[in-house]
Amino acid sequence: MLQEDRDELTMNQKKSPMLFRLIKWTVRTCYHKVSLQGSEHLPDTPCVVVANHCQLHGPITSELYFPAPRVTWCAGQMMELKEVPGYAFQDFWSQKPKRSHWYYKLCSYAMAPLASYIFTHADTIAVRHDARILSTFKKTVAALQEGNNVIIFPEHDVKYNHIIYEFQDRFVNVAKHYYRKSGKALPFVPMYIAPKLKTAVIGEPIYFDPERPMDEERERICNELKNSITALGEALPLHTVVPYRNIPKKLYPKNRPNQEVSL
């Protein structure tokens, strides 16, 4: 089956396969329950929710506990069996000590069948950083027009502050395509996920302004989202932040620097 066909199936299927439902039930049973705060900030209209990735915790939280209809952007490589090992090692484990790389490369191959199955059958939209991104935008606009919210984890390797990493900013272009189709300004909603507190917090929406140049809007929206997510994180009780990168746990930062942390 072609990737685009799989994407359509993922977004339109009425009932997930039994195996996927069993996997999801198992994860829900084993994973801690997440308390969601700030859901009153979700607009009455569909929106794009932008959150910190916090490794696997972000996707798990969005899949199990987001309180409204949603689909989630997913790296297209994680939906292709042959591409999972290389992408998984680079994205999850490449910063581990070099002496252990052989082990994590084995893990990358071992996880490939299950990972590609899960991400293909979850409510996801594949993201590719090439010409296929236009297909991603098209499917995203369609999902929004069907009444779904869209969850995006746009962080990449460059650190922004102690809470969050810099964003790959092209996701903001969804707002331009959505405005052309609907005539509506798309809201972007910040969300901070704190696995150590078993909590996720939703902040106030930031609206796309179609009258401003796109380059300026990308920068403005990304900066406001990053700062809002940071403020949401800092306002919570003192805790250890689970960063985007899978670095040694002893290097995990605190939500308020220079304070003692108990969680």
Regions found by a protein language model. Give the residues of each.
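N-terminal membrane-anchoring alpha-helices
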Residues: 1-31, 259-262
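Amphipathic coiled-coil/heptad-repeat helices and related helical stalk/stem segments
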Residues: 35, 55, 111, 133-137, ...
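Non-catalytic C-terminal accessory region of glycerolipid acyltransferases
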Residues: 2-7, 129-263
